[in-house]
Regions:
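Conserved catalytic core of nucleotide polymerization and phosphodiester-bond processing enzymes
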Residues: 1-291
Length: 291
């Protein structure tokens, strides 16, 4: 998919690879990449890591810099739901998955085991995507009964999240659309369908689309702010890629001390939420090293 295809897509004019970004493909509003798609190059497999290491900056005067929003969707969910437990955890820079595990399994934070944290992480993300007890049991390799108990405990401890989910579905039923943080709408005509499968799909979108869509809004605002700043300051550093919650730059070596903190500042302040944004920044000789 990549090893054979990517070398053939190198431009004969500047000897670089150029992708196309489209705004109107993904229903959530996230940018999609094609020709070639640079947003789905794996990083967890050894081959994927080798492929990422093949991406290098434009010349020896540059490094790669990766700036990645940390847990942006969970932060947006906590902000939308006004869940005090989650908000407090994010404000105090606590491990959100360990915090969730402590609440769900009713143990002290320091007593949370790696297995508890793993299950809590799956619940944190799964709930936002409408995960059921069956889905959770499959993903975690546990019984459906145990999965149902975990979800019930989660909703008891994080009642504001449950309220947000119910309110989102009710809003969508009335309006037949949901909105992102900046007011961009996703229409859900099937939310009142008599077909339970069709309706269920729309209900899951009613919960998740405002969150995913708001994440898309926020990173686009950040991209505009960063681009304008780079142009205004006449810097040599260039923004080269957007991979969902990550921005990748050709960072000029002489500009590291200026660009790194400013990019973090602009990304964190793109849209102000109830919880602070966190941005993880890495620098390296190639994309793998920078991530």
């Amino acid at each position: 998919t990549y090893v054979d295809a990517l070398p053939r897509m190198v431009s004969k004019f500047d000897h670089r690879i150029h992708t196309d970004y489209r705004q109107a493909v993904a229903a959530t509003g996230r940018l999609s990449s094609n020709n070639p798609n640079l947003q789905n190059i794996p990083i967890r497999t050894e081959k994927g890591r080798q492929i990422r290491s093949a991406f290098v900056p434009r010349s020896s005067e540059y490094l790669f810099m990766s700036a990645d929003y940390s847990q942006i969707e969970l932060r947006i969910a906590a902000s939308f739901a006004k869940d005090e437990t989650m908000i407090e955890a994010f404000r105090n820079k606590r491990d959100i998955h360990a915090t969730t595990a402590a609440k769900v399994f009713k143990v002290a934070l320091e007593k949370v085991t790696p297995d508890m944290r793993r299950k809590a992480k799956e619940v944190n993300f799964g709930i936002l995507y409408g995960s059921t007890a069956f889905g959770l049991s499959q993903n975690l390799g546990i019984s459906r009964t145990e999965a149902a108990e975990i979800i019930e405990s989660y909703f008891t401890e994080f009642s504001a999240i449950k309220r947000y989910m119910d309110d989102s579905i009710n809003f969508a039923r009335e309006k037949e659309y949901v909105e992102t943080i900046l007011g961009r709408r996703r229409y859900l005509r099937d939310i009142n369908s008599r077909n339970i499968t069709t309706r269920g799909f729309a209900e899951r979108n009613a919960i998740n689309a405002p969150i995913q869509g708001s994440a898309a809004d926020i990173i686009k605002i950040a991209m505009i702010l960063i681009h304008k700043w780079l142009e205004r300051e006449k810097l040599k550093t260039k923004m080269t890629m957007q991979v969902h919650d990550e921005l990748v730059f050709d960072l000029h070596k002489d500009e590291q001390d200026i660009v790194k903190p400013k990019v973090m500042e602009l990304m964190k302040s793109a849209v102000i939420l109830e919880v602070p944004m966190e941005v993880e920044v890495g620098v390296g000789k190639n994309w793998l090293e920078a991530h």
